[in-house]
Amino acid sequence: SELFEETSIRSAEVGRYQLWLLDEGHCFRDQLVKFCHLKNAPNQRFSYSRGSLETFMHFVEQGNGVTFVPELAAKTLSAEQSELIRPFALPRPARCITLVHHRDYVRHAVVDRLSEVICQAVPKEMLRLRPGQDLV
């Protein structure tokens, strides 16, 4: 695919390719459809699957379309798979994790600890928006 010759991909270009997306209702899919303006894209070729990102990566490795991989998941790919990754051109999408609990929830220490564990598990550079990123 000519996408492999690009160093970055503009969100407007994505609609020209066979896309492997998670099922409707999955937040990652919904955010990408919004960011890339795919909802009403003419001639869009979507493929939905109950499969996983790993399954979609195998399709892409075989030359059968394109998919999206979250940055955190991309950090775990093999060197060969990483060579297939192309970042979005600016602005790049970013996602936000929000912890929500009922105002009467009494175990604030549990929520605080969960927040700490999440922040420790995520690379430090991913804890804040970086220049050129846009929340989706």
Q: What is the predicted function of each stretch?
A:
Residues 3-4, 18-39, 107-116, 122-133:
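Secondary-structure junction motif
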Residues 28, 50, 73-74:
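Conserved beta-strand edge residues that scaffold enzyme active sites
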Residues 18-20, 47, 98-100:
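Short aromatic/hydrophobic contact patches that present stacked aromatics
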Residues 4-9, 13, 54-104:
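Beta-alpha-beta core module
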Residues 21-22, 42-52:
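Short beta-strand-to-loop elements that line the ligand-binding cleft
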